[in-house]
């Protein structure tokens, strides 16, 4: 009975999408024509931070190094902010270096950003193939992927295969200790996408996001991070109503610097938790 009802709902939704296809097409073209194209922010895309005033050896390295790599699309690249300091990585690095657990476990944080606007899961996979293997294994790799797959003609099967391949190359070539996939954003809430197109795009994003979550659950040391957007709004509003558009950049599509800050906080919390857990496993 339940299965029959689900099938009926799918048929109804499919029929609705067929009827609304001309509207979706018109709105999609209008968005491409009218939406402001924001550039990737200027700023450093790699760096080294010394923790606890730890000395650097003659080779430029200290004893315990945390190697962090952020990979992905325009959100990882920080589009929507003016500089990399105001972007996801720019917020993430100082938050991480202030964590007592990071300071006690590591002397140095090496970080790099490998992200490009418009990249799909296939583009990211290709980038990981092209990049040289690191001289040291990557302790944490954070991936932002899926939005461009949602807006392109990537099937659910293609998405699943490409995510699996990303996991394989990250672990094999980069020696990734902890791999974190960030959840897809709530695309139906993006100010730049009008109704009814927003619901159509949001539904496809949800399908890819659910698939991503399931894939991550089948692999060791691969984590799906469900970004808590409600928490971001609650922390910013402090109990008073706010316009959700403050969380988005001027294009109504990418995160604002404000959202990047809240997002980075959640990513940092997860990284600390994962490193603590993996260190405990290694020592037991």
Regions found by a protein language model. Give the residues of each.
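N-terminal secretory targeting modules
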Residues: 1-68, 268, 272-275, 280-284
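Conserved SGNH/GDSL esterase-like catalytic core that processes O-acyl groups on lipids
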Residues: 65-69, 75-161
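Short, amphipathic alpha-helical "lid/cap" segments that border enzyme active or binding sites
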Residues: 121, 125, 160, 164, ...
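Alpha/beta-hydrolase-fold catalytic nucleophile elbow
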Residues: 144, 182-183
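A short helix->loop->beta-strand "cap" motif at the edges of active sites that frequently abuts
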Residues: 174-178
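Substrate-gating cap/lid alpha-helix
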Residues: 189-228
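Short, flexible, mixed-charge acidic loops at enzyme active sites
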Residues: 233-246
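Histidine-centered active-site loop/cap adjacent to the catalytic His
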Residues: 245-284
């Amino acid at each position: 009975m339940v299965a029959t009802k689900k099938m009926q709902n799918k048929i109804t939704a499919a029929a609705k999408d067929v009827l609304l296809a001309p509207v979706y097409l018109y709105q999609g073209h209008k968005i491409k024509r009218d939406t402001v194209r924001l550039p990737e922010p200027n700023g450093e895309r790699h760096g080294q931070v010394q923790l606890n005033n730890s000395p650097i050896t003659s080779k430029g390295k200290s004893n315990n190094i945390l190697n962090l790599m952020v990979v992905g699309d325009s959100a990882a690249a920080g589009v929507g902010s003016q500089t990399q300091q105001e972007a996801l990585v720019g917020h993430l690095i100082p938050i991480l270096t202030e964590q007592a657990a990071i300071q006690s476990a590591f002397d140095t944080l090496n970080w790099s950003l490998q992200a490009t606007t418009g990249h799909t899961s296939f583009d990211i996979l290709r980038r990981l193939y092209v990049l040289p293997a690191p001289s040291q294994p990557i302790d944490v790799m954070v991936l932002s992927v899926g939005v461009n797959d949602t807006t392109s003609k990537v099937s659910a099967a293609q998405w699943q295969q490409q995510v699996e391949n990303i996991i394989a190359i990250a672990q094999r070539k980069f020696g990734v200790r902890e791999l974190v996939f960030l959840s897809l954003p709530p695309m139906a809430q993006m100010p730049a996408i009008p109704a009814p197109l927003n619901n159509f795009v949001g539904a496809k994003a949800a399908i890819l996001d659910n698939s991503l979550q399931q894939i991550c659950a089948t692999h060791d040391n691969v984590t799906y991070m469900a970004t808590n957007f409600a928490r971001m709004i609650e922390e910013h509003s402090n109990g008073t109503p706010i316009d959700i558009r403050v969380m988005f950049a001027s294009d109504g599509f990418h995160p604002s610097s404000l959202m990047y800050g809240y997002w980075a906080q959640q990513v940092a919390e997860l990284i600390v938790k994962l490193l603590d857990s993996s260190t405990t496993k290694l020592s037991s």
